[in-house]
Swiss-Prot record:
This is Kappa-casein. The modification Phosphoserine is found at S133, S150. Pfam families: Casein_kappa (PF00997). The record marks F89, M90 as: Cleavage. It is found in: Secreted. Glycans are attached at T105, T115, T117, T120, T126, S133, T149. GO terms for cellular component: extracellular space. Kappa-casein stabilizes micelle formation, preventing casein precipitation in milk.
Amino acid sequence: FFNDKIVKYIPIQYVLSRYPSYGINYYQHRPVALTNSQFLPYPYYAKPVAVRSPAQILQWQVLPNTVPAKSCQAQPTTMARRPHPRLSFMAIPPKKNQDKTDSPTINTIATVEPTITPITEAIVNTVAAREASSEFIASAPETNTVQVTSTVV
């Protein structure tokens, strides 16, 4: 089946990483009884039936209830995957508007167009008439009223 000249040059690390079934398995495969109970969120490992020798059965019962190594998980096994319990704070509440009927949305805000209104302001110019003479002028300054029209947007 294999060519001996080719096979003996393959490094053992390549075989172990390429084919995980050849890797070292520190945990023996234990059958899992599927339970759909909220009180047992972890897989229940059933006791093995007496198909193997009594020495292996005693060895199975001594093993701790731990998760298998990564080398076991990479293999296609018949073990059931442990379901992840759903936490209540991660639940997404349903949308509130599911029971409402869809109504078309109407834009009630009308667009406001700016109108140009002319504003009339009165500007008062205060001009003091000065004369070339050096005498004191007691008269009030002259006032001129000019109307200015400006457009404000």
